[in-house]
Amino acid sequence: MNWKIHQISIPVFDLKKSKNFYEFLLCNKPYDKENISATTDECFISEGDIELRLYKLKNEIYNNQIIQSRRTYASLALRNLDLIINKISEEGISYFANKTRNSITLQEPGLNYIELCDLNTKKSNSSIMNNTWNFHHINLECYDVRSSVNFIKKYLKIKEGIWKAPVELGKVNISPNQLAIFNLNDNHSGIHINKADFTFSWRNNFIHNPTIGGHPAFSITDINFLIKRLKKNDIPFTDAKVYAMPNIHQIYLFDPSANIIEINQNI
């Protein structure tokens, strides 16, 4: 594999409250609704197979060195990053170089941020078996799916995969102009690209519409236990069950900053 997801960055307004929520969601820690001000600009959620970064949104319009986005974005570790940078430079594609992180950040045609770093400088992900959660996918909402897909194929040199529907397929449009995948394995893990589907939640009787705004997805080992904890703490969620990917039970919910989050489990 010539690429992997190195980090997921989720924008939040209250760092302490958000950290507590994600530790409850992914690490089985107690849920404390108390809002305590945080003094730092970012934090990381541990016990997973990638870096999960929460970063505090601020008014930094005057500082073009600070990446601010209301959408979750991914950091991709790629082979031959220098060749990729040369190619996008030749094509006149703008990017921001972060010397501290040894990375660049650009926008694909759907205007989602993507951070790129060198695969050779990043340590291998920890063993999946030892984690309380694992990364599954990042969903990017794009106005023109094929334009965004072609950009990633051409400049990032990642091969497009094929979406495999489950027998229990819900009311989901999986045509290539609506939904595409760059998969890391046969489990639909990787990058999902979709066009906003305004009637998606209405057709499927969902509280949440995961096609709008994009979302990160994480896998856990006992989704029914999480559902019981969500109910106990009065946290609303959509139980989609198996409906879009084979043998994957999915649920959706909002975090304290109104980011849609997906939690799933292979069954």
Regions found by a protein language model. Give the residues of each.
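Vicinal oxygen chelate
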Residues: 1, 4-13, 34, 43-48, 62-134, 139-140, ...
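Core segments of cupin and vicinal oxygen chelate
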Residues: 1-2, 10-52, 141-190
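Hydrophobic side chains in well-ordered alpha-helices
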Residues: 18-21, 84-88, 148-151, 226-230
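A short, acidic/glycine-rich surface segment
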Residues: 32, 59-64, 122-126, 168-170, ...
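Short, tandemly repeated low-complexity microdomains enriched for cysteine and small residues
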Residues: 33-36, 63-68, 99-102, 163-166, ...
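Short, charged/polar, Gly/Pro-enriched secondary-structure boundary elements
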Residues: 50-53, 111-114, 189, 201, ...
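Structured core of small recognition/catalytic domains
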Residues: 147, 153-243
